[in-house]
Design a protein with these regions (language model features):
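A glycine-rich phosphate-binding loop feature that marks nucleotide/adenosyl-phosphate handling sites
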Residues: 212-223, 329-334, 358-365, 425-428, ...
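Short secondary-structure boundary/capping segments
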Residues: 60, 92, 128, 162-167, ...
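C-terminal low-complexity, glycine/proline- and small-hydrophobic-enriched intrinsically disordered tails
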Residues: 450-451, 481-597, 604-629
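Glycine-rich beta-alpha loop elements in corrinoid/cobalamin-binding modules
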Residues: 80-190, 199-240, 474-522, 530-545
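Canonical Radical SAM [4Fe-4S] cluster-binding loop centered on the CxxxCxxC motif
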Residues: 57, 270-306, 612-626
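N-terminal [4Fe-4S]-dependent radical SAM core
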Residues: 12-44, 51-52, 222, 228-277, ...
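Conserved SAM/AdoMet-binding glycine-rich loop
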Residues: 45-46, 119, 314-421, 425-465, ...
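N-terminal pre-triad scaffold of radical SAM enzymes
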Residues: 45-49, 67, 265-292, 316, ...
């Protein structure tokens, strides 16, 4: 295995031959370098995309901070090299290394992947290969690190089950310490005194450690579970194959968010989000039926204004960044948003700091908030109506009137903003071409009304993505729209939105289908992922890496029909591939909510009325130990039970039929 000095020597010969050498050199301000020889547990945190994207990832920043606070552990980082760098690394025999120490990833005790979305899967396999680590868990032995993954996409971990030793289900701040402690205890148990190298003595020893990890709340070790299938290809059941592990793995939750990191790494190059990012609250109470993040991050927990301000001040001092992003799934729903924005203005007034609140809900953006944001040099306004007819907004449970949208955008333009971003989705359940035409009509009307108050300079950026049904949501039963219908809807929008002041952005339909295959896929897709990667698929979210035909060929090679995963009606009593994984939102609740969507019924903000989704009973002890209003939950109402026969007989609406 190469030493750090040997790796640096080889890097010197190739770095000037690649785009952006700064991606690969490390040494950034606020990066943490510890004395390797005196640290008990070494963790490599990996974001399987390029440095420019990964270094901004908030989840990885949190874990980097958490691990490096320990005196007995270190965390270093690695990202996916771009095509040019990978080719040179392979040609010169350079394994993938951690930026801080330049040590090969294979030297670490634990490698943790962040997998927020499915299109990173082939990159994860490529990174393991570049590190000289077998891609499949079953092929690893006592000389290899433990490989884990977490992130939103792992709420259905099954398409990646063959490659990860373990998955973290849910939030990572506490469980990362449990995992490190378990590894340390195991090392003490297995090693001779004075041997500081993590070296498992046998395959059985590795299995013993994985069995220990499987007993940690929120850790899923897939090799200890077995899936069976019915003749129609659907899942029959998923059961544990060993004792003392849970039949259903429930997500890990932190009762109170720990203090946010304040020593953000200052990158060597310009990146996507060069800013201080402070998470002001976690979770969402709105219950949008398509929203994966909103369902799996319940309940809402908020940080205090004082804690946010203190962290922001420290982070700006430590980095020199000139933008502050106040992050959440719906920042304008933060209970004290006006006070927060006011006090940010008071504290940083007169500086060059720009404040942004990404992800604002139209119905919670008040005129007062607009005024405060304008006074604080806020960035552009981004709003997400998601659909353009009131019928569709009722179906997705994002109900707001057209007039509210127009009035809000008019007020924004009137206060000096010249550009607004609106996000929509196409392909929602029961959507028609008339609903898509309404998106174009609404965009035109926003521009028209904006010109009345701000003149011809107003602009609109309309981002239109394609709906992908996700696990653990009310829409996990629905099928995707067909490729033909998606392309017809996109063509309609291109024809209609040709105003020079309207910028239309559309997602590639093929990218959406790749995401859809993997988001609700079963274990059989692991072979498809592996074959697609071996055939050259990687950077699947990038135009340069798009390899749709390689995925289709991989499906064919393994005798699987991609339409089975995307364009098939799910039975109401179907066992899902993720049935043994839960975000603590009950399946019955999700089905009831789905049934209400078919009837156009809406649910109000669950801070106003608890609908008994299952979160509070699951974490009752945690809530009891943390009283107060940190959790924004009302009293629980009696849960609604559904008759199984009624579930089986209900006719589902099939999108695309």
């Amino acid at each position: 295995m190469l030493t750090p000095e040997q790796i640096e020597s080889r890097l010197d010969k190739i770095l000037l031959r690649v785009q952006k050498p700064g991606r690969y050199v490390g040494g950034e301000l606020n990066s943490v370098q510890k004395d390797w020889d005196f640290i008990q547990t070494k963790v490599a945190l990996v974001f399987p995309d390029i440095y420019d994207i990964g270094v901004s990832n908030v989840g990885l920043k949190i874990l980097y901070d958490q691990v490096n606070q320990r005196e007995d552990a270190l965390a270093e980082r690695a990202y996916a090299p771009w095509f040019d760098m990978e080719a040179l690394m392979r040609a010169h025999g350079i394994p993938l290394y951690a930026l801080e120490s330049k040590r090969p990833l294979a030297c670490f005790d634990l490698i943790g992947f962040s997998l927020p979305y499915e299109t990173l899967y082939t990159n994860a396999l490529n990174i393991l290969d570049l590190a000289g680590i077998p891609a499949r868990s079953i092929d690893r032995d006592e000389t290899h690190p433990i490989i884990i993954a977490g992130g939103h996409s792992t709420m259905n971990p099954e398409p990646m089950y063959a490659f990860m030793d373990a998955f973290v289900i849910g939030e990572g701040e506490d469980v990362i310490h449990d995992i490190i402690n378990a590894i340390q205890s195991f090392k003490i148990k297995r090693q001779d005194a004075g041997n500081a190298i993590f070296h498992l003595s046998s395959f059985d020893a590795r299995m013993e450690l994985l069995h220990t990890l499987a007993q940690i709340h929120g850790v899923y070790v897939p090799r200890f579970y077995e899936a069976s299938y019915l003749q129609d290809g659907t899942v029959s059941h998923i059961e544990p194959t060993v004792q003392d592990i849970p039949r259903i793995v429930t997500k890990r939750l932190v009762a109170v968010m720990p203090p946010p990191p304040t020593k953000f790494i200052v990158p060597n190059i310009d990146i996507v989000h060069n800013r201080v990012s402070i998470e002001i609250m976690r979770g969402c109470t709105r219950g949008c039926r398509f929203c994966h993040a909103g369902m799996i991050t319940r309940p809402v927990r908020e940080r205090s204004v004082d804690e946010i301000l203190l962290a922001a001040e420290e982070a700006i001092k430590n980095t020199g960044f000139e933008e502050l992003a106040l992050l959440s799934l719906s920042s304008s729903d933060y209970s004290n948003v006006l006070e927060l924005v006011t006090r940010v203005g008071e504290k940083f007034g007169g500086t060059h700091l720009k404040v942004s609140l990404p992800s604002l809900r139209i119905e919670s953006v008040s005129i007062d908030l607009m005024e405060k944001l304008r006074a604080n040099r806020a960035g552009g306004f981004t709003l997400a109506p998601e659909a353009a007819t009131e019928r569709m907004r009722r179906i997705i449970n994002k109900y707001i009137s057209d007039e509210d949208i127009i009035n809000t955008t008019r007020e924004i333009y009137a206060r000096g903003w010249t550009t607004i971003k609106l996000y929509f989705m196409i392909g929602h359940p029961s959507e028609t071409l008339e609903d898509v035409q309404a998106i174009a009509n609404l965009c035109k009307r926003v521009i028209s009304e904006g010109r009345k108050v701000a003149g011809m300079k107003v602009k609109l950026n309309a981002g239109v993505s394609t709906f992908v049904p996700k696990s653990q949501t009310p829409f996990q039963w629905v099928s995707c729209d067909t490729p033909e219908k998606i392309r017809a809807k996109q063509a309609l929008l291109r024809r209609e939105l040709c105003d020079k002041n309207i910028k239309l952005s559309l997602t590639d339909a093929e990218d959406s289908f790749l995401e859809a295959w993997l988001s609700r896929g079963d274990r059989r897709l692991a072979d498809v992922v592996y074959t697609a990667w071996k055939n050259g698929a990687k950077f699947d979210a990038w135009h340069e890496g798009r390899a749709y035909e390689k995925w289709i060929a991989a499906f064919e090679e393994h005798g699987l029909d991609p339409l089975f995963y995307t364009h098939r009606q799910r039975r109401t009593d179907e066992v899902f591939p993720w049935e043994h994984i839960t975000a603590a939102v009950r399946k019955n609740f999700l089905f009831q909510d789905f049934r209400q969507s078919l009837e156009g019924q809406i649910r109000v903000d669950c801070r106003l009325n608890c609908f008994a989704c299952g979160i509070l009973p699951t974490f009752a002890n945690m809530r009891r130990e943390n009283p107060g209003d940190v959790w924004k939950c009302p009293d629980v109402k009696s849960p609604v039970s559904l008759n199984p026969s009624a579930m089986s007989s209900l006719k589902l609406l099939i999108v695309g039929d």
